[in-house]
């Protein structure tokens, strides 16, 4: 009797070519995100069919917005909860660092609130760039933690070199959008450009181009230090993380084209973190499984982690249903408005990203 075929390594699956763990996890995260959006789409069409046409009477303004907001807020709350209960926060110094970063996030929120009425397009672009650089930094972390990077190559310099490409792409996109806004003031007869008003002054366009040029020069310098053979060899060496970035940028552009917003990237970021941590827990379970339902069980086991995430997200959705159906989304209910209002979501996101700096 012949022996059974050897199982494939968990780091690789065959789909026309070998996928790395980083790529496979990203695909799984995208699939989970798509499923969540599909659920919110079903709820949205049911609510619209029931005559709930006003936004304050629905659970979400639209499927992508609702999926990103409810899942995103649950992620932000859990990130703080995990941080607050971690061992490294038992000393005073980490809390001081947290307070400083929280204050910095609050200042950025004030700046965003001041810019939003003056130029909502620019505010939205800066918000997207800030979050996407945060997401790309985390993808680099996944890349190394998954063991997909070449052995012995992990260094702060390499991590910086790998984080610059998405920054370049995003700042470049911002520059193109800024140029379009400038043209909008001079070519009002072009429908697409007309929608981008108010225009930006030429000084901002020039400043953006200078930032792009400086960032490109810095990245090329870092790449040459890591890979003397050039940019193409550097990209080939670290293909998994570059492919993930291409997929992420595609999601961003698709979201902009379909909804005019940048919300799906937040949902994708959350599902990427969920898949990454869940896989880490599944492969390295604790030696002694904690009691089911305990905080230790939810924090250290794959099953508990899944229950915690799903439970909190569903609790927030339930709160949103109560706010919309019982109170018609009244802004006078401060607790609901601060936590669940779609206008509050960018501020929660900015705080989360800023507090995560240097993690």
Residues covered by each model-derived region:
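Membrane-interface helix-loop-helix junctions at boundaries between adjacent transmembrane segments
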Residues: 96, 107-202
């Amino acid at each position: 009797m012949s022996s059974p075929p050897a199982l494939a390594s968990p780091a690789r699956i065959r789909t026309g070519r070998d996928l790395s763990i980083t790529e496979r996890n990203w695909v799984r995260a995208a699939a989970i995100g798509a499923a969540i959006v599909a659920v919110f789409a079903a709820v949205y069409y049911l609510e619209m069919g029931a005559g709930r046409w006003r936004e304050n009477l629905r659970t979400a303004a639209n499927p992508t917005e609702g999926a990103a907001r409810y899942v995103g807020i649950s992620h932000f709350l859990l990130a703080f909860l995990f941080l607050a209960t971690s061992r490294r926060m038992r000393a005073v110094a980490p809390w001081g660092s947290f307070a400083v970063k929280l204050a910095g996030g609050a200042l950025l929120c004030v700046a965003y609130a001041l810019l939003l009425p003056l130029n909502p397009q620019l505010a939205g672009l800066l918000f997207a760039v800030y979050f996407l650089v945060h997401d790309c930094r985390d993808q680099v972390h996944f890349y190394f933690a998954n063991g997909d990077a070449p052995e012995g190559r992990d260094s702060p310099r390499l991590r910086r070199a790998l984080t610059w490409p998405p920054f370049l792409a995003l700042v470049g996109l911002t520059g193109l959008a800024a140029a379009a806004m400038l043209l909008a003031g001079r070519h009002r007869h072009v429908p697409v450009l007309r929608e981008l008003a108010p225009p930006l002054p030429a000084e901002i366009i020039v400043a953006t181009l200078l930032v792009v040029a400086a960032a490109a020069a810095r990245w090329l310098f870092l790449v040459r230090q890591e890979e003397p053979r050039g940019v193409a060899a550097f990209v080939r060496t670290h293909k998994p993380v570059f492919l993930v970035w291409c997929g992420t940028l595609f999601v961003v552009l698709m979201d902009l084209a379909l909804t005019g917003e940048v919300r799906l990237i937040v949902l994708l970021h959350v599902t990427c973190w969920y898949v990454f941590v869940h896989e880490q827990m599944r492969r390295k379970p604790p030696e002694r499984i904690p009691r089911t339902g305990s905080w230790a069980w939810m924090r250290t086991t794959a099953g508990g982690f899944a229950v915690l995430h799903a439970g909190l997200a569903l609790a927030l959705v339930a709160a949103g249903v109560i706010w919309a159906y019982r109170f018609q989304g009244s802004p006078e209910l401060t607790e609901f408005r601060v936590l669940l209002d779609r206008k509050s979501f960018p501020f929660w996101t900015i705080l989360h990203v800023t507090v995560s700096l240097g993690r």
